[in-house]
Design a protein with these regions (language model features):
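Conserved, single-site charged/polar hotspot
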Residues: 2-6, 10-396
Length: 396
């Protein structure tokens, strides 16, 4: 499983640039149409919509050795450098920059951007196999086909070249070279997320069926199964308000979290994020939980009406608040969105007066597939193959 990847490089908003500035320490070859020229080592090349070379169509940049710096973007690593080749094209909306690179080199800049390079090697190997599998399922993606690319370099697909390469993540990619996860002979889309609450869920969270994705199973992550039916509100309430030291994510910051919002804060935040004004919120009721306990349908009643929020992403956006402290296992923080929908909502009262709501939850992310923090804990005593089999049942 070795192929080339073509990805659009994004700025903070989209894939279009008003100006694109490149530099290579070794110099580079610039191909325009049937002609080409070379730049001196360290020489800067600037493209804007008036650049005459665009008259010949797509412009290709090839480093003489090493990589090319793209000075028009800023990443966690500062100014990023790209291996492989770079293609620069002009469209009505602006300049589009596409990086073409071999998949193994691509992964060496994805894995440290998606998982801390200080994690245990077996966990990093899991991430490498997951990232490679995910990348192959996206080869058929036509999202950016109009621009000569499969994907972009953002969280919408997989984060690429945002954190520095590390020896540990390079080793993880090399030691799993070419390996992907398959189910019945087909490469699977390996969803993963940061932290579990002690329970995973399955694709019913996103309205799909388990028949289509049988390798995603809602199950206990490490601890003893407490025999609770987590789709039942009262039993999930018991689960999320308890902790289990045997859970692989137990020591993680967002294994459990809670926040308290006043009626004013939660009502204004809800109206702002959903565009639905129900007035002052009087009641929040979870109408449906999927396997594993994640909420997918929440009824909100206010003094001006009621509405139902019916998707995981919408629920997380509707009740998060960047202006309110969230209590975690390692202090307080703030989030614009809820970390997950593995949560319960409770009224806060003074006497008989409703003053606010407390949200108690666990985990960070959607909860489908592999918990990265759990994988790191499991890697202390398990191989990457064993960890992957745990999170992606029946895959090889």
């Amino acid at each position: 499983y070795r192929r080339q990847r073509q990805m659009c490089i994004r700025d903070s908003r989209d894939i279009f640039f008003n100006e694109a500035v490149f530099c290579a320490d070794s110099g580079m070859i610039v191909e325009t149409g049937e002609e080409s020229y070379e730049t001196a080592p360290g020489e800067t090349v600037v493209f804007n919509p008036d650049t005459e070379d665009f008259n010949e169509g797509r412009i290709k940049l090839i480093p003489k050795s090493g990589e090319i710096q793209f000075q028009s973007v800023n990443r966690g690593i500062g100014t990023p450098s790209y291996g492989g080749t770079i293609e620069v094209s002009l469209y009505d909306e602006g300049i589009v920059v596409v990086n073409e690179v071999g998949i193994e080199d691509y992964l060496k800049k994805v894995v440290p951007s998606e998982m801390p390079s200080g994690f245990n090697l077996e966990a990093l190997k899991c991430q490498a196999v997951c990232a490679r599998s995910y990348a192959y399922t996206e080869l058929s993606n036509n999202y950016y086909s109009a621009y000569g690319a499969h994907i972009d370099d953002s969280i919408q697909f997989q984060v690429y070249n945002n954190s520095p390469r590390a020896e540990s993540t390079d080793t993880a990619v090399d030691e799993t070279a070419g390996q992907v996860l398959s189910y019945n002979g087909e490469v699977v889309k390996t969803y993963y997320y940061s932290t579990s609450c002690g329970s995973t869920t399955d694709v019913t969270l996103w309205g799909n069926t388990t028949e289509n994705y049988p390798y995603f199973v809602a199950e206990c992550v490490g601890g003893v199964d407490r025999g609770l039916t987590l789709t039942v509100e009262s039993e999930f309430n018991t689960f999320i308000k308890g902790e289990n030291e045997a859970d692989y994510d137990y020591d993680c910051t967002l294994y459990r979290w809670s926040m308290e919002e006043s009626v004013k804060e939660i009502s204004e935040g809800f109206a702002r994020s959903t565009g639905k004004n129900v007035g002052n919120i009087k009641d929040i009721e979870v109408l449906e939980r999927v396997n594993g306990g994640a909420a997918v349908k929440v009824k909100v009643t206010g003094d001006k009406g009621e509405t139902v929020i019916d998707s995981e992403s919408a629920i997380r956006a509707a009740f998060g608040n960047a202006n309110v402290d969230m209590n975690t296992k390692s202090g307080t923080t703030r989030y614009a969105n809820l970390p997950s929908t593995f949560c319960v909502f409770e009224k806060v009262t003074e006497g008989k007066k409703l003053t606010g709501f407390k949200i108690t939850g666990g985990g960070y992310g959607h909860g489908i597939g592999m918990s990265q923090n759990a994988a790191n804990k499991m890697a202390e005593s398990m191989t990457y193959a064993q960890i992957l089999e745990f999170f992606y049942r029946g895959t090889t």
